[in-house]
UniProtKB/Swiss-Prot annotation:
Lineage: Eukaryota, Amoebozoa, Evosea, Eumycetozoa, Dictyostelia
Gene3D superfamilies, per the entry: Phosphorylase Kinase, domain 1, Transferase(Phosphotransferase) domain 1
PANTHER family associated with the record: GROWTH-DIFFERENTIATION TRANSITION PROTEIN 5-RELATED
Record bears the keyword Membrane: yes
Protein name per UniProt: Probable serine/threonine-protein kinase gdt8
């Protein structure tokens, strides 16, 4: 019995021992090679299962390394801690678990070179000298930190002092280099390496930020430009501020170089004093392989020519195992091009941060940075390489956050790659088949296997050699402010359906493509240095016919376009024909350039036109109108730049939109051309999906060959197509009192909604209509294509096919709408008697017959057809306010229609009324367009007396007394009545000007009097001005008072402008010129700033007593009211996101040389409490000022709680004061208490000057946030960070919090699933 128990105990001990050491097995190899250690790359990630060998094999250098003695109180490296340490020769050391050592390179009299340093505990390197090693292995749980440069030597290099010809070979080539197997590596240099620069002259540049002090160093830099993507060396001298560099002994800086980057490069062979190396930056030499859920942080490091993987087809090392012993390798087939030997190869690591680093490779490699199932945040870095890609993102890489990086690629020849690739793969397959005949257990290394069944490069995970910026298989990418130049594709996506074949994972979440999100904001792409082909893409997608779950894309393409194309299948050559016009798939044979701004996103499977079964002709329109674009963030401009013929003077642009309503509120749509608004906040309202067409004219006065068309919406209106027409001056059709339709409409849908009055017909005989369709249920998103939609001339023809059956009903509807809009007589206007010296035309009496109206019109020689004049974006003149009372006649107080009292009214066209007219509506020859502000427009009215009596005629024209937006220019001659003889005709001319954005839709009266009796009829004026920043005061409706500032008589209301909820800031006009100048300054600044984190300026308006500033409305209120007055408790991650958005906005303002002057939570508006998109925007620019040539502004009228010490000292308000105020606001948001509430308000200036800062609950704030706060409000203003630095730190903090939250939610979900499974099992058992 005892023997059986002992046997079981021994068996258990053996099992436990085997289990504990299963991850690290010793693999014996043939003579001449290192024995290998087998490492499970993802042993604890159960979702990854594979039938193939995915283990990692690295040289067994740690097993016999010298292990340190752990001596209490000794935490610094000394040789005596490692028994057997040889001070005269190479050593391999092992930092044991639970031990921590500090290596001070400069304090040691001897420079120690290590063959291997294995870290299972903690190892820190400090000092100014390089840390020289052959291999650094960070074991699971180990931690390595260094502020010194790391220099690698090759132990087999015959020139090296430690060369030993008996050193065995590393079959996989991990060393020299770094191997991280699940620990933490942090290599951070103190000084910046990469700088942005602007050209001053051929031999001088200005860099940003300024260089750090550089004393006694070899001042050599490498300059990268578009002409020289690999850079060139320069010596230099700098000014005292270290911003202006005078270049010596180098190539000139070309005027054509728009992108200039500067790198401080330090090499070992430079004559630099070791004590000064620290000041010039750190270099890292050696291939780096990171795996096993490691934590990675590199900052200000230089990775130079580390990559060994060439741009040739992969050829990996293969191990031939003994069929009788899984730990014995019988043969090694050495690979010639292993895929993981890039400068930096990272896999299965979700916490990777790279900041301010430089990657440089002038040899032809595959890529400097390769990611496999890893997430990375990379910022402020430079990647210049002669490679297939700057970055390759393989399976499972779910997130790349890239900001302010420069991706530079040298032109490469890819012509022979595909042929060589297939030949190589076929050879590899033959080798694999032969090997498999010998051993069924033949395995490849590191998930880098050539699959026998794969015979093309993509199926073998051999990709990214085409000349890409970022080549991606599955990640979500957020690119913000990056610069790409020289690539064939800036972003190249490849979706492969059978991931198990390629990733060797048979049961994995990677088997299905995940949702894709690509967001590109303010990034630029210049393909100047690529291979010269016209087929260059910012974004390219190759799906091989596979579908992803969903796709959320922002795209920007710079390739040439067809006039029209389909979007169903990019690889198809399908064409469809409408009336002989062809529409083709894709844009590979395009004719004419078109780009779409980077802040847009695609939506697929929009409601289909073909659902309208009564329109047999439009069945195929599904393929044209099933996709559309809109902005990522609400109310942000999406800009379409399209090519036109510079020799054609007049154009008509037609945009076709699909409205998918998200609620019952109207959606405002604004359209701009060349930065000039054409439609502003036009409300689109429907309860079901609707198509809307907008058409406008453009006069190409400057012979442009490309125009910018933009639109803004809250996100539920999609631009599905665009058509451009060249046009000529078209004379208006003959007008008659009674319009007779020329076409009979055919059957139309019964549910067609009322047409929007702003929609206009195209220049053809076929009309425009709206088509309403039912919204499709369960829309399944498809892969969005890489080409942003811009359908040109032929689209208009297709639209006409859709809509030609609605001509008469829409014409009547438009007319009825106009009449309804003008049916109300305005009161409170001054009476104007219109008098015009009559032009009497004698004609014979015609008893019982009507006058010939056609002849009346033919006599009118004043009708013209002015073409719309497009101006530049509204200048200061357009928004200029006046504090002088307007003296124009429209500011009267009498009733315009008071003289109509006791007069009999007749309907227009009544047979009993004695007069006839050539038109009922005065449109001032605009023909559907809008007039420009301040444009003088003219019209005339032919009046015919059809009676036998002479009449006295008065024309009573309405006036606008509220805002003065309507100015009657020839009012001085309308001061008395005139006579009109029987059967005579006269012409009355009208001239007026609209001085703001307004709709002048009014009735005017024609009053006739004879023999003591009076009668009148009404005609109409229908004029609308173009959109601008100067609004009509009467169209602004205030509803709810939000805030008031009584001393200055400033009030803030919630209101409405043309059915759009807005914030209205109303000022009372006073005699105080200073107060009025302040209002003008706020208007000027608002009109210039345009950023997603700054409240959107809609316009301003003025009447006799008040000025209004209108901005977008934040329904959540201010951040100050949210934290102090609301019962809602904000989470920590919400607060960080809100202040991150604010910091981004202030970064933009400071870059525009604008100081806000009044930063506090009350001036941060909350638009969304979600932690995605834009949550907070900056408002209230009453204290803002443009610095211009000045370095500071005078003390603002700001709250003392947020003013810094230097302002109280009288130094003026600078950018640093904004940073101080932001720090105080960040503190207030975190602790939710008014800053300085613990002291008397009047004591704040003195206490702040003495260095006192808010202390209440400061110690409860998160350490990272508290450091930001303390840096912001530090007394020395020169030490305060910039907002770009603040934004970066908040961005990193937010990303970490978001990652933790997602992990927590995933853990909770898994727990709930397991609990539910257990409950189900218990139920089954019961």
């Amino acid at each position: 019995m005892i023997n059986k128990i002992l046997i079981k105990l021994i068996t258990i001990i053996i099992f436990c021992f085997s289990f504990l050491f299963a991850e690290e097995d010793l693999i014996r190899t043939p003579p001449g090679y290192y024995n290998l250690t087998r490492h499970k790359r993802y042993p604890h990630i159960t979702e990854y299962q594979s039938s193939q060998d995915t283990d990692l094999y690295y040289p067994d250098v740690c097993r016999n390394a010298l292990r340190n003695d752990i001596i209490p109180g000794v935490d610094e490296f000394f040789p005596f801690l490692f028994p057997g340490f040889n001070s005269d020769g190479p050593n391999s050391i092992y930092i044991q678990k639970n031990s921590s050592l500090l290596f001070k390179s400069e304090s040691l009299g001897t420079t120690y070179n290590f063959v291997a340093v294995c870290v299972e505990g903690s190892f820190t390197v400090k000092g100014s000298m390089f840390f020289t090693i052959n291999s650094l292995i960070i074991l699971p749980g180990g931690r390595f930190e260094s502020e010194a440069g790391i220099e690698f030597y090759d132990e087999n290099d015959p020139l090296h002092i430690y060369n030993n010809p008996d050193f065995p070979k590393d079959p996989f080539g991990f060393f020299p280099g770094i191997l991280v197997l699940g620990g933490t590596i942090s290599v951070v240099a103190k000084e910046s390496l990469v700088y942005r620069a602007d050209r001053i002259s051929n031999s001088s540049i200005e860099i940003s930020p300024p260089f750090s002090p550089m004393n006694k160093i070899n001042q050599t830099i490498r300059i990268f430009t578009e002409l020289y993507p690999l850079g060139f060396y320069c010596s230099f001298s700098s000014d005292l501020e270290r911003k202006i560099l005078s270049l010596l002994d180098c190539l000139p800086i070309s005027e054509n170089d728009k992108i200039i980057r500067v790198l401080i490069e330090v090499d070992r062979d430079q004559n630099v004093s070791p004590t000064n190396i620290l000041k010039k930056g750190k270099t890292t030499k050696g291939s780096i392989y990171i795996t096993g859920d490691s934590n990675v942080y590199f900052k200000n490091m230089f990775f130079k020519n580390l990559g060994f993987t060439t741009n040739e087809p992969y050829n990996d090392t293969k191990l031939i195992f003994s069929p009788n012993d899984p730990n014995q390798v019988t043969d090694i087939i050495m690979g010639t091009n292993q895929r993981f030997r890039s400068s930096l190869y990272i896999e299965f690591s979700k916490n990777v941060t790279i900041d301010g680093c430089a990657f440089f490779e002038d040899n032809l490699t595959r890529s400097p940075l390769v990611l496999f199932d890893s997430n990375v945040i990379i910022s402020n870095s430079l990647i210049s390489s002669k490679s297939g890609s700057n970055i390759i993102a393989q399976y499972g890489t779910e997130s790349i956050q890239s900001s302010n990086n420069s991706y530079i690629l040298v032109k490469i020849d890819t012509a022979s790659l595909d042929v060589d690739q297939n030949n190589n793969n076929n050879n590899n397959n033959n080798n694999n088949n032969n090997n498999n005949n010998n051993n069924n257990n033949n395995n490849n290394n590191n998930n880098n296997n050539n699959n026998n069944n794969n015979n093309n490069n993509n199926n073998n995970m051999d990709y990214g050699n085409q000349g890409n910026g970022i080549y991606s298989i599955s990640p979500n990418i957020n690119s913000n402010g990056d610069s790409f130049f020289g690539q064939q594709y800036a972003f190249n996506y490849y979706f492969i359906s059978k991931n198990s074949v390629n990733s060797n994972q048979d049961n994995s979440s990677l088997l299905n493509s995940k949702p894709i999100e690509l967001i590109i904001i303010d990034s630029s792409f210049n393909p100047t240095n690529s291979n010269g082909s016209l087929n260059k893409y910012l974004l390219n997608i190759n799906s091989d016919g596979n579908k992803t779950i969903s796709t959320y894309l922002v795209c920007n393409s710079i390739i040439e376009y067809y006039s029209g194309w389909l979007m169903d299948n990019l690889n198809s050559n399908q064409q469809i024909s409408f009336e002989g016009n062809l529409f083709q798939n894709g844009c590979n044979k395009v004719d004419g350039n078109c780009t779409i701004s980077q802040n847009s996103k695609y939506s697929t499977d929009l409601p289909k036109v073909a659902n309208q079964t009564k329109f047999d002709e439009i069945v195929q329109l599904d393929k044209l109108f099933s996709n559309g674009i809109t902005s990522i963030n609400p109310n942000e401009k999406v800009i379409i730049s399209t090519k036109i013929n510079s020799k054609i003077h007049y154009y008509q642009i037609q945009l076709f939109f699909t409205h998918l309503p998200i609620d019952d509120q109207p959606t405002p749509l604004s359209i701009y051309i060349e930065n000039q608004p054409v439609f502003l906040l036009e409300p689109i309202k429907s309860t079901f999906p609707t198509f809307n067409n907008f058409t406008f004219k453009f006069e190409n006065k400057n012979s442009l060959d490309k125009i910018n068309i933009a639109f803004t919406t809250r996100g539920d209106i999609y631009l599905t197509s665009m058509a451009t027409y060249s046009s000529i001056v078209v004379e208006p059709p003959t007008e008659t009192p009674t319009e007779t339709p020329t076409e009979t409409p055919t059957e139309t849908p019964t549910d067609t909604p009322t047409q929007t009055p702003t929609q206009t017909p195209i220049l053809t005989s076929k009309p425009i209509t709206q088509i309403s369709v039912d919204r499709n249920e369960n829309l399944e998103l498809k892969i969005a294509l890489p080409i942003c939609l811009s359908l040109a001339l032929l689209i208009g023809i297709i639209i006409m096919i859709c809509i030609f059956k609605k001509v008469q009903s829409n014409s009547k509807l438009k007319k009825d709408d106009d009449e309804n809009e003008m049916a109300t007589i305005k009161e409170g206007n001054k009476s104007i008697i219109v008098s015009q010296p009559p032009t009497v035309i004698e004609e014979k009496p015609q008893d019982n017959s009507k006058p010939d109206d056609q002849k009346l019109i033919e006599r009118d020689q004043q009708i013209n057809n002015p073409i719309l004049k497009i101006r530049e974006y509204p200048s200061l003149k357009d928004i200029e306010l006046s504090n002088e009372e307007t003296k124009s006649p429209q500011y009267g107080s009498l009733n315009s229609f008071s003289t109509l009292q006791f007069s009999r009214q007749y309907d227009y066209g009544s047979e009993e009324f004695p007069f006839q007219f050539n038109k009922q509506v005065l449109e001032f020859n605009l023909n559907g367009r809008k007039c420009m502000n301040d444009e003088v427009i003219n019209d005339s009215l032919m009046i015919h007396n059809k009676s036998e009596i002479t009449y006295l005629v008065n024309i009573i024209f309405p006036q606008n007394i509220e805002t003065g937006c309507v100015s009657i220019l020839n009012v001085e001659i309308f001061n008395e009545s005139f006579e009109l003889l029987p059967h005579c005709t006269t012409e009355v001319k009208f001239s007026l000007t609209l001085t703001c954005t307004t709709k002048f839709l009014e009735n005017f009266a024609v009053l006739v009097e004879a023999q003591g009796s009076k009668c009148h009829t009404f005609l109409s004026v229908h004029v609308e001005s173009e959109t601008s920043l100067k609004l009509d005061y009467k169209e602004i409706k205030t509803e709810q008072l939000i805030a008031s500032y009584l001393p200055s008589k400033v009030y803030v209301f919630k209101g409405y402008y043309r059915d759009l909820a807005v914030a209205v800031k109303k000022f009372a006009i006073s005699d105080n010129s200073k107060s009025f100048e302040k209002i003008k300054n706020e208007v000027q600044i608002l009109s210039k700033v345009n950023n997603i984190n700054v409240v959107r300026y809609i316009g301003s308006a003025q009447n006799i007593s008040h000025v209004c500033i209108v901005t977008e409305y934040a329904k959540e209120g201010s951040l100050g009211s949210l934290i102090h007055d609301s019962k809602i408790k904000l989470s920590f991650i919400q607060k960080v996101k809100f202040m991150l958005d604010a910091a981004k906005g202030f970064t933009f303002l400071h870059a525009s040389e604008i100081v806000h002057g009044d930063i506090k939570p009350d001036n941060l508006l909350v638009f969304s409490k979600e932690i995605s998109g834009v949550c907070v925007k900056i408002c209230d620019f009453g204290n803002s000022e443009e610095l211009g040539e000045k370095e500071s502004k005078s003390k603002p009228d700001s709250t003392m709680n947020y003013l810094p010490n230097e302002v109280f000292d009288g130094e003026g308000y600078q950018k640093s004061a904004d940073v101080y105020a932001f720090g105080v606001s960040l503190y207030e948001v975190m602790v939710e208490k008014i800053p300085f509430h613990e002291i008397c308000y009047n004591d704040i200036p003195n206490r702040v000057q003495d260095g006192f800062r808010p202390t209440a609950d400061l110690d409860t704030i998160d350490d990272d946030i508290r450091k930001i706060i303390e840096c912001c409000w530090i007394k020395e203003k020169s030490k305060r960070p910039s907002f770009s630095e603040i934004s970066l730190h908040l961005e990193i903090k937010f990303s970490k919090l978001l990652h933790q939250m997602n992990e927590s939610e995933e853990s909770t979900s898994n727990h709930n699933t397991n609990s539910k499974t257990k409950e189900d099992k218990d139920l089954d058992e019961n």
